[in-house]
Amino acid sequence: MNIEVGNISYTGAIISWSSSEPCLEDYYHIMYRPNWNSIFSGYLRYSFHHEEKVPRTISSVVLEHLAPSTLYFLCISCKKAAFPYRHYCTMFHTLDKSPLAPGSSLVDPQISLWVLMAILLACFTAVLAFICLQFWCVRCHEPRWSYRAGHMEEANGLVRWPEEAPDLGQREEDLQGLPLVEMPRKNSRDGAELDPEANQDAPDAGALQRGGGDPPAILPHCGE
């Protein structure tokens, strides 16, 4: 079947066809719809918005009340001997009602929709990339390792000691300047008797105090 579309205007068109095989039914099925959603729907009969029945003795029809500047998808079908139902389809575009009017849009609405979706997707990708970059920068500027109070802390190559560290160092220096005195072992068997040699070698605490020196440090011994 050959389909021809002629006399296309803003809101109408004339459709004519010629078939080599006769139609077994009493009429032809003329189905058409705007092609706005052709990407998302197939060429099914139930997806057509308009359907007209034309007697088989007629080979042309006038379509009216069409939308200006719109792409239409049209199919003609009839029951034949070789094929129960076969669709013959074509496409045509109505004229623009005011192509030279100021402010008129010559862009297809479907193309505008795809461009808008692409812009929104690009904006979302840019925002997501910015958030990931900020998170990566924060992770890079964090200290490599650190410890809490009582330990050494390192941040950006600088070593910081806790506040207790200088006090501990001063206490050790103070203890190093004091003499050591051995205390008797209380829990040992010979704890009651003191070694005379140890008593002779041990300095007199009173003499040290009279001499103005520092008092001796007494170190306890654990019991055996």
Swiss-Prot record:
Membrane topology: Single-pass membrane protein
Subcellular location: Membrane
Predominant localisation class: membrane
Keywords, alphabetical: Membrane, Transmembrane, Transmembrane helix
UniProt protein name: Fibronectin type III domain-containing protein 9
The Fibronectin type-III domain, residue ranges: 1-101
Domain of life of the source: Eukaryota
Chain residue ranges for the region called Disordered: 175-224
Record's compositionally biased regions (Basic and acidic residues): 183-192
Organism: Homo sapiens (Human)
Entry's transmembrane regions: 113-133
Keyword Membrane: yes
Entry GO CC: membrane
